[in-house]
Amino acid sequence: MVVSDITFRTVAYAAGRDKESALHNNLVRQAFTQGYLATQGLTIRRLTDKRGDVISLPRLLRDVKSNLRLITREVYVSETGLPYEGDFRPHVRFDQLAGTRSDRRQRRDRIPRRVVDTIESWLDIDEIDEVVDWSHKFLAHAADFQRKSVDLTAISLTMDKIAAAQKAIVRAAEAVSAYILHMPSHMAVVPVYQFSKFWRFDQFVSSETVAEAAKFWNSPEDDRNNWTEGVYEALLSTSAT
């Protein structure tokens, strides 16, 4: 989802820098843009689906909230095989999330529901609803969209909403995974490729534009990799209320 978005933005940037590029071919431009919009709309729609018969973030958060009784301090601290005794990081983190003092620790301490409520609220934003609504219309009236010419300027607002929706999803996923379920945290949102992202891209644009596109990629990549900053602090502010 995130990589697809950065890829589209970078290719669109490269096309804008090279007016003679084959990327301006109407068929290529239309197929690439419609593929991007359909993929983003469907992915965000699926990840934020609130129904109970699907796999999504809202479904996961509801399941976590209804089973918080199972995530006790003892389970949280010792699930990796570490001994329960000791004043190490898992204990301190649980203290902070549960709002308890270190001298009053109990094995059956639990994380309050309001922490999960906060994560759910991060998904309750207009941008997600608007992208989901737009996705419904895109799929229901696909033929109409296919007949329309592609105007990147016209969809820039939609791209901004897609980025906002992605950010909310990433932050919610990081919060529940790394801090509630005590799974590994993400060091980066965008994966580090072990190959050249722009291999043979000079077949579509000039070599100068390839170099510019490579630099352009770094900006949204850095921005997305910072999306998880402050997630834990936001949860702690909830625990303190």
Predicted features and spans:
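Amphipathic alpha-helical interface segments
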Residues: M1-D126, L152-T241
